[in-house]
């Protein structure tokens, strides 16, 4: 009898508690500025957190159970680890698609960290995340317009195509025509992205931190920190618009010799807000569409050189770097001036899109990063160690850092032959690099933890550019490294000349500049010989 009474009391308390919580929640939702959005947040966030918890637990258990009792370094352990990596990558992929929003962005980040995370994760994310982003309905697009400008798309523009031409993790792009007849691209943020971003970031933090506690070698908290810092800026399209204009201004002021070959769309400020960005519509070929580039009368080789020089100038001279240069964000078109190269082919102009993610390098970081690349190109082991340590790699991981930057083993990095940094892109090279990433997973994770976040974004940028140049040059990388060597050397020398020095030190810098130019000329000539030999053997 007493037990039944106690049960009834507990039941009543549960009912009253549920009613109070439900009533309070309903009152909170009803009194909010946007009840429908608040309701969606209150129902979706717990579900996402639950999915994160289940996925993290499943991945952790799989690694712990599957690798139990397998000897470190054995072929059996390597085989099983590959299978676990693949299963875990697929679970993470499924989580990203189900949760959407910044989870897609996280998956895209992982897909671009080639040789920094296990190859199974990179391949799984790259095959899906870059081409299968969510699409907002036209009704959701109209909702964003109403909130931002108080009008529907067909009122703001003379014409507005309701079907997007492209969609990414944070936004999608529509073609429109202004009332004065200009064709424009309108970037529309996915509905409620800003509302869910903070909660999603916290939920992702639970996932990453949980995996790190279980597996200390899995330390990708830096990726979470980077997303937490970058995401608010990427979600503000007015920041992107300012980056767009600053990028072009830097080329005009600091790199006038290539300024006419680099372009970014004109921004229509009167038709832009933090969630709507209206810009000039750009025609051209995607940078990895080699066939279309050739049809435009442009040599892919010229495009590869322009891409390498453009981003080398950003990194080593401007200190203001576009950190998401994947193929969809780079368009090639014939230079509007009509200029041609010595072979009569049209010169390319590189159009850079999506300026939401930029990083600034302070003077010391930029100087050391430029000095490191100069040392890598010229096989200077002492300088590689010195500047790697100054960037945070330490005296125990500088060799690994050099390998990650160049994608070559140490013995090849310090080889003094002119083609020591060539990557042919064949299956043997790719397999070697993938094995390298898997074998040194713990060391790579520790290195990434040590390096400044801005350098981590430079690594991601390097991977994107390497992928683009591999497609343009069919795997050959020497020309790109020579351009990097030239621009990084110029940046180092400019920094040294800017210091107040004695006549003797000034002469030393002058001689260093002369020596660098001579070495680069010899390397360029050797490259020409290699290219002639290659053409004769075809």
Swiss-Prot record:
Keywords: Signal. InterPro entries: ABC1_dom (IPR004147), ADCK1_dom (IPR045307), Kinase-like_dom_sf (IPR011009), Mito_struct-func_regulator (IPR051130). CDD domains: ADCK1-like (cd13969). Residues 1-26 form the signal peptide. Disulfide bonds: none annotated. It holds the Pfam family ABC1. The keyword RNA-binding does not apply. Belongs to the protein kinase superfamily. ADCK protein kinase family. PANTHER family: AARF DOMAIN-CONTAINING PROTEIN KINASE 1, ABC1 FAMILY PROTEIN. This is Putative ABC1 protein At2g40090. It comes from Arabidopsis thaliana. The lineage of its organism: Eukaryota, Viridiplantae, Streptophyta, Embryophyta, Tracheophyta.
